[in-house]
Every structure is written in structure tokens, then in C-alpha cells.
């Protein structure tokens, strides 16, 4: 009988490029590919250690002199909606949720383009065409859903979230919505609705991506109770956002080789840095 040993994930580091969150900073990412057998287990394990997924790549910040970007997740059991968040839920009661397999549609792309053009025209995704959008949605080696929110009155697609289903929660990979409805707080609404989905499914967490102190576009995440950030190799409740700073320092981040050595992988594999 022949046994095939699991292939150890290879970890790489991107070249530095301008940080999209903090002006004047440079970002760098540590990443690996999701391929072969065991991708679900690898995705689950690394998501619990601050990694995020983009198509078939898992990555997390590994900046040389800055550690401001921290993965964030909401503990469903510890979440209590504020009065404002309850109003947001009520304001969007006319939206119907539908979770589908990861398949891109023309309606999704039209909404996606409208969202980018009006909210993130200078962002790194601003030039994505329909084929690149389809790849973002459909090229997933793990269990992924497209969660669509449709207006019951007009039948218009109003918001979309590309969501991964993990063993311990839901990961909101990317979300977008009608930019002409700021009063509806659709971004906040989708997070609130995912908390409810996770609660109904018995999943303890909703992963939100990164929280960055000092970044205005990321500040809304700190408004959710039960928020935890991945800091110093462990998940820490964010009780006082002001206690975290975005200051940079050459000793803020451990050497890449040390970061890779400390990554915990599914049983039977060990990380390798290339």
C-alpha cells in the first residue's frame, strides 16, 4: 500500500507597495496558495490565525515596520446590538436574503461597478472587469456562498456578500451594496445579518477582515460589541479601541522566518518559507 504525504504549504512575501489604509506607509503580505487535498482544513486553520482568503490565496499583513492591521472577528455569543444597529435592522426589513452557490451574474457586476465607481474609484479594484469579477466570485476551492439582498418592493439587487463558511464561523470575504442609499447603512446591515445567520447555524464567529486603528474606512468595525482582534498571536477582545495605535517601529513585526515557523498547520504538514 502506498501513502501520499501531504504537501507542505509554501509561504511567500509580496514586494512592498503603498498601504491602502494608512497614508505614507508601505504594506507587505505573507501568503500561500490553497491547492491540493486538505484545502478546507488549511483555510480553517489559517483563518483562525489572522489570514484572509482571496480566490485561491491566503494572506495576512507582514509589514516590515508596522503591525497596525489586525484581523477582526465578532464573537456571536458576546454581541449585543446597539440602539442604532437595531434601527439599521428595522430600516432594511424590506430586503430579502438569498444564499447561492458562488456564481457571478450580470446584476451582481452592475452593482459591484456602481459601488466601486462611487465609493472606491481610486482603490486597487477600481479597474476590475467582468471577467476578473467572475474570477473573484467563482475561483474558490472551499465552501463559499454568495449572499444576495433584494428589495422586495422593486426586486432590485441591493447588496451582496461573498462569504466563506468556516468550521467556526462565517468569513465575509468581500461585500458591496447600492451606494445611493447611505441612510440604510447597508454595510453595517450585512454584518448584523451575518451575525444572525451564524447564530442560527450555531457558528461562534463572524470574520470581518482587518481592523486598522487610525483608518477612517475601518473605524466602523469597532462599533460592534463582541469584537476580537488577532494581536500578538492570539485573539483579544477589543474593549478599548484607543489602546491600540497605528505607530510604526522597526521592531513592530517579527522576522518573516519566525512568523512562518510559528504558524500552526493541520496535522501532518509543516510550513516552508520560500
UniProtKB/Swiss-Prot annotation:
Where does this one sit in the cell? Cytoplasm
Superkingdom of this entry's organism?
Answer: Bacteria
Q: Which cysteines are cross-linked by disulfides?
A: none
List the EC numbers from the record: 2.3.2.29
Q: What is this protein called?
A: Aspartate/glutamate leucyltransferase
Q: What is the originating organism of this protein?
A: Ruegeria sp. (strain TM1040)
Q: Which family does it belong to?
A: Belongs to the R-transferase family. Bpt subfamily.
Q: Which UniProt keywords apply?
A: Acyltransferase, Cytoplasm, Transferase
Entry's Pfam families? Answer: ATE_C, ATE_N
Gene this protein is translated from: bpt
Which lineage ranks, top first, belong to the organism behind this chain?
Bacteria, Pseudomonadati, Pseudomonadota, Alphaproteobacteria, Rhodobacterales
Amino acid at each position: 500500500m502506498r501513502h501520499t504525504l501531504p504537501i507542505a504549504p509554501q509561504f511567500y512575501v509580496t514586494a512592498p507597495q503603498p498601504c491602502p489604509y494608512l497614508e505614507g506607509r508601505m504594506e507587505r503580505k505573507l501568503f500561500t496558495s490553497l491547492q491540493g487535498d486538505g484545502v478546507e482544513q488549511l483555510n480553517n486553520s489559517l483563518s483562525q490565525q489572522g489570514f484572509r482568503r482571496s480566490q485561491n490565496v491566503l494572506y495576512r499583513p507582514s509589514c516590515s515596520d508596522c503591525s497596525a492591521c489586525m484581523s477582526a472577528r465578532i464573537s456571536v455569543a458576546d454581541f449585543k446590538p446597539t440602539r442604532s444597529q437595531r434601527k439599521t435592522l428595522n430600516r432594511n426589513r424590506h430586503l430579502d436574503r438569498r444564499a447561492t452557490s458562488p456564481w457571478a451574474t450580470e446584476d451582481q457586476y452592475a452593482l459591484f461597478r456602481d459601488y466601486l465607481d462611487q465609493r472606491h474609484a481610486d482603490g486597487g479594484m477600481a479597474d476590475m472587469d467582468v471577467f476578473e469579477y467572475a474570477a473573484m466570485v467563482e475561483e474558490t476551492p472551499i465552501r463559499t456562498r454568495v449572499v444576495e439582498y433584494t428589495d422586495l418592493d422593486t426586486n432590485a439587487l441591493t447588496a451582496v456578500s461573498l462569504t466563506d463558511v468556516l468550521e467556526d464561523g462565517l468569513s465575509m470575504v468581500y461585500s458591496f451594496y447600492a451606494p445611493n442609499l447611505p441612510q440604510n447603512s447597508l454595510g453595517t446591515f450585512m454584518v448584523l445579518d451575518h451575525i444572525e445567520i451564524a447564530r442560527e447555524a450555531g457558528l461562534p464567529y463572524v470574520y470581518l477582515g482587518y481592523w486598522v486603528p487610525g483608518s477612517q474606512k475601518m473605524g466602523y468595525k469597532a462599533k460592534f460589541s463582541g469584537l476580537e482582534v488577532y494581536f500578538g498571536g492570539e485573539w483579544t477582545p477589543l474593549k478599548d479601541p484607543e489602546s491600540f495605535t497605528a505607530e510604526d517601529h522597526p521592531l513592530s513585526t517579527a522576522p518573516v522566518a519566525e512568523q512562518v515557523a510559528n504558524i500552526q498547520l493541520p496535522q501532518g504538514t509543516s510550513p516552508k518559507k520560500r
